[in-house]
C-alpha cells in the first residue's frame, strides 16, 4: 500500500515583464511516494547520476530544514518536468520537500505558511507559489514577508518549446545588469502593471502584447536564447496571444486561446524541429497530497 504520495506541478515564471513576481502552474508533475521508514534517507529515482539519492537530495534536505526531527524514510521520486529548462524543477522539489516535512512531521502548515517558507528557500515567490496554489499567481517579497494573489486563467492554453540544451539559472542571471536606469525602471514597471491588470481582467490580447515588451531581463538574455524572436513571430502568425522566456530559459512559453493550443503547437513543431514542442494546460489545483494510512515521525 502506498502510505503517502505528493504531486507538485511545474511552473513558468515572469510571463515577460512580471520578473520574479508572476508565475503560472503547468501540467507537468513531480511525484513523491513515501515508503517505509529506514535508518537513513534513500531517494529512489531514474534521473541523471548527479541527482543525490541520500539526504543531500533537494527534496530531503528541504524537508529536514523545515522539520529537523524527521525520521528517515525511503522515498521514490518521478517527474516529467525537464531539469534546468526554466520550468520550475527546483521550485517543485522545494515545494515537495516542504510538504514532505508537513505530512511526516504533522506540522499542520497553512497554505500561506508553505508559500512563505518556500519563498524563503527560493528567494522569490513566482514559481513556488504557482506550484503550491495552482493557477496564475502574482507575488511580492518585501524583506521577509511575502504577499501573493491567485487568479484563474482557464481560458488560456499553454505551449512550451523545450530545447535539448540546459541553461543554469545562475548563468542566466549573470547576464542581467546590476544597476537599472530610473527611466527604464519606470517604463518596465508600467508594462508589468498593465500585464497584471490584463491578466486580472482576462484581456488576453493585451496580456500577449505586454508579455512581449519586457525590459527587465529578456533583452539581456537574448544572447543565450537566440531563437526567441523567430519563435515569437511564428507563434503570433499562428494565432498565439504572446510568447516569452519561461523563467530564466532556455524554454519558451507561449499563451494561446485554449481551443487553438493543439493547432498552434502542431504548426510550431513543423517549423522548430530541433525543439520539443509540448502542448500543456494550466494546472489549477496546485500541490496535492494522497494519504493512504497514518504515518508518524
Curated annotation (Swiss-Prot):
Q: Which EC class is the enzyme in?
A: transferase
Indicate whether Amino-acid biosynthesis appears among the record's keywords: yes
- Which function does this protein serve? Catalyzes the ATP-dependent phosphorylation of L-homoserine to L-homoserine phosphate.
Q: Which InterPro entries is this protein grouped with?
A: GHMP_kinase_C_dom, GHMP_kinase_C_sf, GHMP_kinase_N_dom, GHMP_knse_ATP-bd_CS, Homoserine_kinase, Ribosomal_Su5_D2-typ_SF, Ribsml_uS5_D2-typ_fold_subgr
Source species = Bacillus thuringiensis (strain Al Hakam)
Q: What is its main location?
A: cytoplasm
Q: Which UniProt keywords apply?
A: Amino-acid biosynthesis, ATP-binding, Cytoplasm, Kinase, Nucleotide-binding, Threonine biosynthesis, Transferase
Question: What's the catalysed reaction?
Answer: L-homoserine + ATP = O-phospho-L-homoserine + ADP + H(+)
Q: What is its EC number?
A: 2.7.1.39
Query: Where does it live in the cell?
Result: Cytoplasm
| Lineage of source species | Bacteria, Bacillati, Bacillota, Bacilli, Bacillales
According to UniProt, this protein's pathway is: Amino-acid biosynthesis; L-threonine biosynthesis; L-threonine from L-aspartate: step 4/5
GO molecular function, a single term: homoserine kinase activity
Keyword Cytoplasm annotated: yes
Name its GO BP terms in alphabetical order.
Answer: threonine biosynthetic process
Provide the family line.
Belongs to the GHMP kinase family. Homoserine kinase subfamily.
**GO CC annotation, single:** cytoplasm
The molecule here is called Homoserine kinase
Binding of ATP, residues: 82-92
Q: Enumerate the PANTHER family for this protein.
A: HOMOSERINE KINASE, HOMOSERINE/4-DIPHOSPHOCYTIDYL-2-C-METHYL-D-ERYTHRITOL KINASE
